[in-house]
Amino acid sequence: MPKKQLPPKEERHKLFGSVPPKERTKPIEKNKMADLQNTKRDFLFKLDAVGISNVKYPVIIHSDLAPKEQTSIGTFEFSSSIPTMSKGTNMSRFMELLQEYSSSGMNVSISELKRFTKELSGKLEQKDATIEVSFPWFFERKGPESQSAGMNHADAKLSVTYDSNSGFSIDVSLSAWITTLCPCSKEISEYSAHNQRGNVTLEATLVEDFDEAKIDWKLALLEAAESNASARLHPVLKRTDEKMVTEQAYENPRFVEDMVRLIAADLYEMPFVSKFHVSCRNEESIHMHDAIASITYDKSSE
């Protein structure tokens, strides 16, 4: 049995600083409350983006790789521009619309986000709206010889902007891990060569009429990254697999510069990509520093 005789909970709250409510003088009816955000006046500058970020919600991901449908956690950012004559935006409307979509299952698809941004633009009474969602995308990966399976993942991002004047713009991004083996180390050494994990980030602007029913953009970017690496990463490797992966890496040495150029070539050949940015960071196994390289290319500039 407790030995202490404690005061009632209300008294404990008072002990730690709680005070009784004061007399209320401001209106409680919505139509009588001050609405500062909707104040119309010259506020000096138009704002490019106003909204909310770091919003986490469950989402449904569709994939051409197993698992074909998966539930993940989406991290959202919502925004719109506001003109000089508007003080602010209606922050609650971002969350209200997200909850509405989530209640029937929020699919992270280009078509869904197009519909969302156009509707959001109307609710905000602004000419544009942007939604960006980041999420971990899981995919099954089998050992090259044993076929022993496990799950890998990459960090994906999809951003859709609607503008009542110019239509939709679609940007995608994927960050994935790969293996790189140093060409210089292989060339100068009697045997062996140092190798390491590299992190590749591919950012691409898609054409407005991109057809996600025909092409899984996540898989297209993943293949561009992994197919140009010294070797792919695997969650499960038996001895026969490890031999194959090790030898493959030795046969395909890559500098960090090589990686971004080879990936850029693949993206350049994709007709549904209008511009892109590729960066690679190798966690050097024989140094304390990382090696980096990047490239940006806009096909429309040709």
Curated annotation (Swiss-Prot):
The record marks 182 as: May be catalytically important. Belongs to the GTP cyclohydrolase IV family. Keywords: Hydrolase. It comes from the Bacteria. Converts GTP to 7,8-dihydroneopterin triphosphate. GO terms for molecular function: GTP cyclohydrolase I activity. Its EC number is 3.5.4.16. InterPro entries: GTP_cyclohydrolase_FolE2, GTP_cyclohydrolase_FolE2/MptA. This is GTP cyclohydrolase FolE2.
